[in-house]
């Protein structure tokens, strides 16, 4: 049996995604009650980082330990990935020593090349194309607070980059309407827009985009690797700051999410994370629980069919 990978939300069926989310909620409850649950005892997660991280590293490392396993952190200084050794060769060797691999990288092609040669599951911890693990946490957070997201309206405000791409995939997989509010020149790649079909639309006016929305989401205006564009981006995105007043135009039960870290005074107002409609802290914690469910889903079948 070949290994299952999680490089994008499209790698799982809708039922599988919903099952992972439900199990993430169960694992969260077990942890809060102090119940020991170690289905991945003696399993090892290899974590390859080409980009710095706080939430991704801590959530995966802590999650694997809580499931009874262990995690190995590999920084660019620790590996030959893409430096002298072909990615496929690294995948063959590393996947013979660990039970699952998580990669946080720049080029999405690194993930696909690694997965093609890996004998164990590979997880996308973030690439320049998508961030599916964050979407698992976001969808779990919405389900916990509001129930099913099917048929709801979600507004993405900001850059049409990797997080936005994953929201387009989520609109397809979870069947919700997605409005994208962004300046001209910052739209998502046409491949993703085509994927979203009639579930996705671009609206230039942020106020119009949030009207009656059930979920409003944003992210930083300048991602890692784009620092030289900061001044230009600040000018272009200024009309897209999410404030309490903007949320007032959304549905009465609207939720606000941000994958963090947040730049207060830029993409959000200084006080927005303190607004009762913000669930950003729950969202951040749910990275731990959703990814534990994902690890169990991927590693246990791979182990039993080995």
From Swiss-Prot:
Its EC number is 2.1.3.3. Its main location: cytoplasm. GO terms for cellular component: cytoplasm. Carbamoyl phosphate binds at residues 53-56, 80, 104, 131-134, 259-260, 287. Pfam families: OTCace, OTCace_N. Pathway: Amino-acid biosynthesis; L-arginine biosynthesis; L-arginine from L-ornithine and carbamoyl phosphate: step 1/3. GO terms for molecular function: amino acid binding; ornithine carbamoyltransferase activity. It catalyses: carbamoyl phosphate + L-ornithine = L-citrulline + phosphate + H(+). Disulfide bonds: none annotated. L-ornithine binds at residues 162, 219, 223-224. It is an enzyme of class 2 (transferase). HAMAP family: OTCase. Belongs to the aspartate/ornithine carbamoyltransferase superfamily. OTCase family. This is Ornithine carbamoyltransferase. It comes from Pseudomonas putida (strain ATCC 47054 / DSM 6125 / CFBP 8728 / NCIMB 11950 / KT2440). The lineage of its organism: Bacteria, Pseudomonadati, Pseudomonadota, Gammaproteobacteria, Pseudomonadales.
């Amino acid at each position: 049996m070949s290994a299952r990978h999680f490089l994008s939300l499209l790698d799982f069926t809708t039922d599988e995604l919903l099952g992972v989310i439900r199990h993430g909620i169960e694992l969260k409850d077990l942890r809060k009650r102090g119940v020991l649950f170690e289905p991945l005892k003696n399993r090892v997660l290899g974590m390859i980082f080409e980009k710095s991280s706080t939430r991704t590293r801590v959530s995966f490392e802590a999650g694997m330990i809580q499931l009874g396993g262990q995690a190995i952190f590999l920084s660019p200084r620790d590996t030959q990935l893409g430096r002298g050794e072909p990615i496929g060769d690294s995948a063959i060797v590393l996947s013979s020593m660990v039970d699952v691999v998580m990669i946080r990288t720049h080029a999405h092609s690194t993930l696909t090349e690694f997965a093609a040669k890996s004998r164990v599951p590979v997880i996308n911890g973030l690439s320049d194309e998508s961030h599916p693990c964050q979407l698992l946490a976001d969808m779990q957070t919405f389900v916990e607070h509001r129930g099913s997201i099917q048929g709801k309206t979600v507004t993405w405000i900001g850059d049409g980059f990797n997080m936005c791409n994953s929201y387009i995939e989520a609109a397809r997989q979870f069947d919700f309407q997605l409005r994208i509010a962004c300046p001209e020149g910052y739209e998502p790649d046409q491949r993703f827009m085509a994927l979203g079909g009639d579930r996705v639309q671009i609206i230039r006016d942020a106020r119009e985009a949030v009207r009656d929305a059930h979920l409003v989401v944003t992210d930083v205006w300048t991602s890692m690797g784009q620092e030289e564009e900061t001044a230009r981006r600040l000018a272009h995105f200024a009309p897209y700051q999410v404030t309490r007043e903007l949320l007032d135009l959304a549905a009465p039960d609207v939720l606000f999410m941000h994958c963090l870290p947040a730049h207060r005074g830029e993409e959000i107002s200084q006080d927005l994370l303190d607004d009762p409609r913000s669930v950003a802290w729950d969202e951040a914690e749910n990275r731990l629980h959703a990814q534990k469910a994902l690890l169990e889903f991927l590693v246990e079948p791979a182990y039993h069919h080995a």
